[in-house]
């Protein structure tokens, strides 16, 4: 079953993009699926929120967890949420979703989980699962700018291309200092000021950065290859702009702060993060709120076998906490 109405209404200026019209379907492999199933199944859940639907891999597995739970509830559910309207439009008519009354697909951010619960006349969920990585669909979409390989792609970087401000416009709306600070804070890029200066110089010359290749070339010139020989010189800058444009860290922080209000006592939150900024927020949120009991003293990592089969999982970290009764 699907929900056609979006959970969120944009409060900021929006700029539509053709990227929102379709979503290419690629072979997306969910990260740490066995671990997610293990930690969620143990509580025999009746309502699970998959806050990052993506390719639907975790949602399918979580639906089977519901089936295994043997609940007395008449309406066990997996509430799947995704920010990308193209993904929701693509998948809402798939038979495994449309014909399964246990699955509800919503358009919105995981920060709007309480709205999804309210739409179904529910007050609490038993589990929340978040996989904070980029999906294969997003990486494959040439209109998004998530990959460095398409030089003429628009520098967009939005998860929801129908709302908010694309990265190239964000750059034009901020000062050189604000750009440098964002690249340093969200990308931990040591050469952020060099990069910001070049971006700002182009804007002053009325030749602003609008394409992926233009920003990649600036990063190549500003980041000494010997300093970051293990990663592409543009990696940290693109990460920083993506985080800024989508308010990723703010949304994660607010969600974990509010989650104890709508996760049932005894329920669990499982978060898969992919870089230190996200992981730090998750760790501190679980540690600082007495309503959480940390179940993973150290973050769990994917097995060697999974990394070999799915290289994008190599940097994943899973933390799980229980809502104290």
Curated annotation (Swiss-Prot):
Primary residence: cytoplasm
GO cellular component: cytoplasm
SUPFAM superfamilies for the chain: Putative methyltransferase TM0872, insert domain, S-adenosyl-L-methionine-dependent methyltransferases
A GO BP entry: rRNA base methylation
Region annotation (Disordered) ranges: 1-28, 303-325
InterPro entries reported in the protein's UniProt record: RsmH, SAM-dep_MeTrfase_MraW_recog, SAM-dependent_MTases_sf
GO function terms (MF aspect): rRNA (cytosine-N4-)-methyltransferase activity
A Pfam family that the UniProt record links to this protein: Methyltransf_5
Documented EC number(s): 2.1.1.199
Bias-annotated ranges (Basic residues): 314-325
Keywords: Cytoplasm, Methyltransferase, rRNA processing, S-adenosyl-L-methionine, Transferase
UniProt: S-adenosyl-L-methionine binding residues: 56-58, 82, 110, 131, 138
Stretch forming the signal peptide: none
Biased composition (Low complexity): 15-24
Compartment(s) where it occurs, according to its Swiss-Prot or TrEMBL record: Cytoplasm
Catalytic activity: cytidine(1402) in 16S rRNA + S-adenosyl-L-methionine = N(4)-methylcytidine(1402) in 16S rRNA + S-adenosyl-L-homocysteine + H(+)
Recorded family membership: Belongs to the methyltransferase superfamily. RsmH family.
NCBIfam families: 16S rRNA (cytosine(1402)-N(4))-methyltransferase RsmH
Functional description taken from the UniProt entry: Specifically methylates the N4 position of cytidine in position 1402 (C1402) of 16S rRNA.
Name of the protein: Ribosomal RNA small subunit methyltransferase H
Organism of derivation: Rhodopirellula baltica (strain DSM 10527 / NCIMB 13988 / SH1)
């Amino acid at each position: 079953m699907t929900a056609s109405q979006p959970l969120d209404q944009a409060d900021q200026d929006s700029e539509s993009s053709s990227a929102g019209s379709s979503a290419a379907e690629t072979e997306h492999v969910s990260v740490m699926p066995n671990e997610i199933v293990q930690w969620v199944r143990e509580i025999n859940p009746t309502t699970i929120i998959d806050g990052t639907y993506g390719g639907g891999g975790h949602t399918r597995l979580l639906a089977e967890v519901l089936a295994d739970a043997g609940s007395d509830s008449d309406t066990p559910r997996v509430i799947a949420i995704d920010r990308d309207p193209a993904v929701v439009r693509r998948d809402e008519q798939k038979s495994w979703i449309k014909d399964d009354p246990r699955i509800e697909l919503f358009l919105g951010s995981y920060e709007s989980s309480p709205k999804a619960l309210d739409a179904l006349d529910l007050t609490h969920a038993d589990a929340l699962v978040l996989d904070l990585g980029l999906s294969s669909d997003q990486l494959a979409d040439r209109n998004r700018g998530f990959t460095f390989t398409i030089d003429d792609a628009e520098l967009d970087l939005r998860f929801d291309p129908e709302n908010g401000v694309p990265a190239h416009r964000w750059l034009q709306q901020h000062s050189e200092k604000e750009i440098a600070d964002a690249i340093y804070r969200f990308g931990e890029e040591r050469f952020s000021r060099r990069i910001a200066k070049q971006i700002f110089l182009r804007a002053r010359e009325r030749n602003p950065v609008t394409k992926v290749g233009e920003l990649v070339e600036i990063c190549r010139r500003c980041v000494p290859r010997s300093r970051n020989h293990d990663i592409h010189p543009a990696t940290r800058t693109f990460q920083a702009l993506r985080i800024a444009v989508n308010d990723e860290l703010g949304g994660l922080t607010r969600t974990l702060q509010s989650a104890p209000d709508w996760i049932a006592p005894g329920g669990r939150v499982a978060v898969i993060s992919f870089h230190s900024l996200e992981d730090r927020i998750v760790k501190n949120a679980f540690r600082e709120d007495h309503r959480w009991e940390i179940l993973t003293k150290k973050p769990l990592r994917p097995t060697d076998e999974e990394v070999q089969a799915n290289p994008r999982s190599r940097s994943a970290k899973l933390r799980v906490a229980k809502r104290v009764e």
